Every structure is written in structure tokens, then in C-alpha cells.
Swiss-Prot record:
The protein's name: Putative ciliary rootlet coiled-coil protein-like 1 protein
Keyword Coiled coil in annotation: yes
Coiled-coil regions listed: 21-86
The entry's keywords: Coiled coil
Family label: Belongs to the rootletin family.
Top-rank lineage group of the source organism: Eukaryota
């Protein structure tokens, strides 16, 4: 009877030891997984910060491009306005030139 009890206790001890080893292995795996997740979290955090900075940089660039676009549109309107006025101004200058040419020829003829 004592031998049977001894064997039973030894088997229970062996099972308990095996269970403890399984638990230790599980704890080791969980710690490795935790470390991996922490590493992933750190990388995602760095990526998020980088993306936030990129967004700020792009917003500044968009603002700059919008300002340049507005300036160029103003210059385009001015050029279009000048192009509209140019033919009338050219006609006026041609008439002025003709008047001066007639006056010059008149002066030459009177000499």
C-alpha cells in the first residue's frame, strides 16, 4: 500500500513538473510575443510621426503652390488685359506716326 501511494505521488509529481514546464514554455512564448508586439508598436509610432511630419510638409507645399498659382493667375489676367489694349494702342501709335509723317513731309515740302 505504501509503495502504491509512493508511486501515485511520484506520478502526480511528474505530471505537476510537466505542467510547470509547459507553463514556463507558455510564459516564455508570451514574453517573446510581447516583445515582438512592443517592437511593432514602436515602429508604428515612428511611422505615424513620420507621416504626420510629411502631412505638415505637404500642407506647406500646397499653400505655397496655391500662392504661386494666384500670383500667376494675376499675371495672366494682366497679360490678357494688356493684349486686349495693345491693338488699340498700336492703332493709335500708327495714326500718330502717320500724322507726324504727314507733318514732316509738309515741312520738307515747304523748305
Amino acid at each position: 500500500m505504501l509503495q502504491a501511494k509512493k508511486t501515485e505521488v511520484a506520478e502526480a509529481l511528474t505530471k505537476a513538473e510537466a505542467g510547470r514546464m509547459e507553463l514556463e514554455l507558455s510564459v516564455t512564448k508570451l514574453r517573446a510575443e510581447e516583445a515582438s508586439l512592443q517592437d511593432s508598436l514602436s515602429k508604428l509610432s515612428a511611422l505615424n510621426e513620420s507621416l504626420a511630419q510629411d502631412k505638415l510638409d505637404l500642407n506647406c507645399l500646397v499653400t505655397q503652390l496655391e500662392e504661386e498659382k494666384a500670383m500667376l493667375q494675376g499675371r495672366q489676367r494682366q497679360a490678357e488685359q494688356e493684349a486686349t489694349v495693345a491693338p488699340a494702342e498700336q492703332e493709335w501709335l500708327e495714326e500718330l506716326w502717320l500724322e507726324q509723317e504727314v507733318a514732316r513731309q509738309g515741312l520738307e515740302g515747304s523748305l
